[in-house]
């Protein structure tokens, strides 16, 4: 969704300037946070309610030191406004598995992304009604000496959950954590990572630092 106020355009010497086209930064920020799932103060933030969530906008003009190399009369003499360094690579590690074909992506990153997407699905479809928006994933893949994939060695998942979940287990935090762990195995890991990739003694770490209950959030 693009939220803009009214705008005017000036055309001069084959150059177009847009004036007055100001994004509604506050609305965009609220919409993005709400789409992620932060719609309740109880779980960390209610982005939809101004009384409970304020959005501060700090948008300023470009640094004068950078601007002096950008705004030039001659297009040929204009410099870059900033520099960026990007790196990455394509590979065929994902292409041996039907669920991952077409990605041409490093296997650990591809599997981590699939886990993250699955965390959102189990929350939005109420498969795990106690799940909350804040979640993180990491996958460690073991390789043979020739560089071929041996299998998944470690899966790390952190998932925020309902603070009342322990009440289902007589207040036991240990039982609560084991329930979260088994649920992640059944509904996230085993339906996301191809079974042939999971090494027999792979390590699964769920909420490794302990309880991760409400409130969480950004």
Predicted regions and their residues:
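Short glycine/threonine-rich beta-strand-turn micro-motifs
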Residues: 10-22, 151-153
């Amino acid at each position: 969704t693009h939220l803009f106020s009214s705008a005017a355009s000036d055309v001069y010497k084959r150059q177009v300037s847009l004036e007055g086209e100001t994004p509604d930064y506050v609305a965009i920020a609220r919409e993005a946070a709400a789409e992620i799932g932060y719609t309740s103060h109880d779980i960390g933030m209610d982005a939809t309610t101004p009384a409970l969530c304020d959005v501060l906008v700090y948008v300023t003009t470009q640094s004068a030191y950078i601007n002096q190399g950008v705004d030039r009369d001659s297009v040929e003499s204009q410099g870059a406004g900033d520099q960026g360094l990007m790196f990455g690579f394509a590979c065929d590690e994902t292409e041996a598995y039907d669920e991952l074909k077409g990605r041409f992506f490093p296997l650990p990153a591809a599997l981590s992304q699939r886990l993250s997407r699955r965390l959102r699905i189990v929350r939005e479809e109420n498969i795990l009604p106690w799940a909350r928006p804040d979640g993180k994933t990491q996958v460690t893949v073991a390789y043979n000496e020739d560089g071929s994939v041996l299998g998944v060695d470690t899966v790390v998942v952190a998932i925020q959950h309902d603070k009342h979940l322990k009440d289902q287990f007589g207040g036991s935090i240990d039982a609560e954590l084991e329930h979260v762990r088994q649920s992640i195995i059944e509904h996230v890991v085993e339906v996301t990572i191809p079974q042939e990739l999971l090494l027999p003694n792979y390590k699964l770490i769920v909420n490794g630092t302990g309880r991760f209950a409400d409130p969480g959030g950004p």
